[in-house]
């Protein structure tokens, strides 16, 4: 039987683009581990993706995961859009390159071994774990120490 894990995630950006951060909580059998980091220049969507990626990459074996995010971009991207992006060679329906492709590919690789149920929660609506992730993400964004090397300025 697979281990059952809960993951809660959030991303934050002070300006968009601007300094940003992510926060994630991984819960297994009542124990929690938190993750957060801040980047000097990024976007909110990249930080939302990073939160999910980092938490999933921390799992050491196959797990059954319930992943809660307040990002429709992440949830819809991974449950609906990614299949066609991959078929089209990481292009959108109008043949443009997928934004944040580096992170979508990393997220796709991180989910390979897990059974994942994606849940959307309304942000800033009193969901305790989402609020904690938001606090982690905001604190990280206020003290950014990393460079988001995959971030590309849109022209």
From Swiss-Prot:
Cofactor note: Binds 1 Mg(2+) ion per subunit in the absence of substrate. Requires millimolar levels of Mg(2+) for maximal activity. Has low activity at micromolar concentrations of Mn(2+) and is inhibited at higher Mn(2+) levels. Can bind a second metal ion at a regulatory site, or after substrate binding.
Annotated InterPro entries: RNase_H, RNaseH-like_sf, RNaseH_domain, RNaseH_sf, RNaseHI
Top-level class of the enzyme under EC nomenclature: hydrolase
GO cellular component: cytoplasm
MF term (GO), any: RNA-DNA hybrid ribonuclease activity
Co-factor(s): Mg(2+)
CDD domains: RNase_HI_prokaryote_like
Disrupted gene: phenotype observed: In a strain that encodes a retron, the msDNA is abnormally sized.
The reaction(s) this protein catalyses: Endonucleolytic cleavage to 5'-phosphomonoester
GO BP annotations, alphabetical order: DNA replication, removal of RNA primer
UniProt keyword list: Cytoplasm, Endonuclease, Hydrolase, Magnesium, Metal-binding, Nuclease
Domain RNase H type-1: 1-142
Main location per the UniProt record: cytoplasm
Stated consequence of mutating residue 10 to N: Loss of activity
EC numbers, comma separated: 3.1.26.4
Keyword Hydrolase applies: yes
Quaternary organization: Monomer.
Family: Belongs to the RNase H family.
Name of this chain's protein: Ribonuclease HI
